[in-house]
Swiss-Prot record:
Protein name: Peptidoglycan hydrolase Cwl0971
Family: Belongs to the peptidase C40 family.
Source taxonomy: Bacteria, Bacillati, Bacillota, Clostridia, Peptostreptococcales
Region (Disordered) residue spans: 89-115, 174-206, 267-299
Annotated active site: C330, H383, H395
Stretches assigned to the NlpC/P60 domain: 300-427
First-level EC class: hydrolase
Induction: Transcription peaks at 5 hours of bacterial growth, followed by a reduction, and reaches the lowest expression level at 12 hours of bacterial growth.
Biological function: Peptidoglycan hydrolase involved in cell wall lysis and cell viability, which affects toxin release, sporulation, germination and pathogenicity. In vitro, exhibits hydrolase activity for B.subtilis cell wall.
Composition-biased stretches (Low complexity): 179-190, 275-291
Length: 427
């Protein structure tokens, strides 16, 4: 028989821990989103419809708990369910001021964990993103596990630093602490210096699978400087591999490092980049606009930030006049992305956005540029999106009578190539 004892705080009576499918949470309990973007759904299941999207650091009121899901209040009018794995509750922060002692809300654990991230993992003073950074761990580092609390591990690094890190990026391992650890080593920007764990893989090629431009860096990690870019479909020569990064040789002869997450080994040969001079025709005469047939991407760091953020919104439904975060129209989507990704404020309506910033000639589009269209055939702008590279753009598609959603389309398609008017750059 399952017995649930109600905790009566006024009498100080403790509750016996029991397993129940669903319990009510205190209306005062708060949670903080720990994922970069978290879908909020109509019910406690990933099969339920999305009703909103929340971003890292957002604080919500927790109304109910059920089988690994939290029912949360997003706004005065929106309530939905989010995975508890990506919501850190306020209760998990109690007692974390002294990092050498177990927290009152954490469960003591033992063993070691291995860091699994594409870049570096933040280590914080408490179990939540609202706590200050006390260190960083690199991909492949092995750390000592001390406690577990609401999707966070309390860990001890090889240099003695103790703090909290998201358990999403740590897997339990039998390896010893300090294995592959580089948290305390001096970083280098010299890509010719071979890391100790580098594995030679001469004679193989790799193909870029990223939907957006892929950064090429001077070393195996995001802390290294960007020395080039690759587009989806590019084939490069693989030289070696180190902790989730490939050392590659580009067709231009440049040697650098790229994340292995976006490279698949291939039998295809490397190619010289096609001369893009055929695409350099300016749109000085809007009445004789050529169809879009391709582009030479010249990405920037801010452009990549814009595109990466826009991709987190894919699938959000169209609603005429909406500007987010749970519904958009086309210009509401672009305005929201520029504001929340790089802090740039642009006009609200599409025709004004098409006159904002700097005009970019066809063939010179870069990821993060605004692209604008005339879908009515009257010569004026009535639709906008954001160029993501590789001749593709992301936009909130739909009309007032035929709503759609945020998605990616190809500018070289028979339809979009004919209605494209141009591009503008805001950063």
């Amino acid at each position: 028989m399952i017995v649930v004892k109600k905790a009566i705080a006024a009498l100080g009576i403790g509750a016996v821990a029991v397993s129940v499918s669903s319990i009510n949470a205190s209306a005062l309990e708060k949670g903080t989103v720990t994922a970069s973007a978290l879908n909020i759904r109509s019910g406690p299941s990933s099969d339920c419809d999305k009703v909103a999207k929340l971003y890292k650091g957002k604080t919500v009121e927790i109304l109910e708990k059920s089988n690994g899901w939290y029912k949360v209040r997003v706004s005065s009018s929106v309530v939905g369910w989010g995975s508890a794995k990506y919501i850190s509750t306020s209760g998990s922060s109690e007692g974390t001021s002294n990092q050498n002692n177990p927290t009152s809300s954490g469960t003591t654990i033992s063993g070691n964990g291995k860091v699994n991230v594409s870049s570096r993992l933040n280590v914080r003073s408490g179990a939540g993103t609202n706590y200050s950074l006390v260190g960083k761990a690199n991909n492949g580092d092995v750390v000592k596990l001390l406690e577990q609390s609401n999707g966070w591990y309390k860990i001890k690094l090889s240099n003695g630093v103790t703090g909290w890190a998201s358990s999403q990026y740590i897997s339990k391992t039998s390896e010893d602490v300090g294995t592959n650890n580089s948290s305390n080593s001096n970083s280098t920007n010299n890509s010719d210096k071979k890391p100790s764990s580098e594995e030679s893989i001469e004679g193989k090629n790799g193909k870029v699978t990223s939907a957006v431009s892929l950064n090429v860096r001077s070393g195996p990690g995001t802390s290294y400087s960007i020395i080039g870019k690759l587009n989806g479909g590019d084939v490069v020569e693989l030289k070696s591999k180190n902790n989730g990064w490939y050392k590659v040789k580009l067709s231009s002869g440049t040697i650098g490092w790229v994340s292995a997450s976006y490279i698949s080994e291939t039998n295809e040969g490397t190619k010289e980049k096609p001369n893009s001079s055929s695409n350099q025709n300016s749109q000085s005469n809007s009445n004789s606009k050529p169809s879009f047939t391709g582009n030479s991407d010249k990405s920037t760091a801010k452009g990549s930030t814009i595109v990466d953020f826009a991709y987190t919104l894919i699938g959000i439904p169209y609603q005429w006049g909406a500007s987010g975060p749970d519904k958009f129209d086309c210009s509401g989507f672009t305005q929201y992305v520029f504001k929340h990704s790089v802090g740039v404020s642009i006009p609200r309506v599409s025709r004004e956005q098409a006159n904002f910033g700097s005009a970019i000639s066809m063939g010179n589009y870069a990821p993060g540029d605004l692209v604008y269209f005339d879908t009515d055939g009257d010569g004026t702008t009535n639709h906008v999106g954001i160029y993501v590279g590789n001749s593709k753009f992301i936009h909130c598609s739909g009309t007032q009578t035929n709503p759609n959603k945020v998605k990616v389309d190809n500018l070289t398609s028979s339809y979009w190539s004919k209605v494209l008017l141009g591009a503008r750059r805001f950063v």
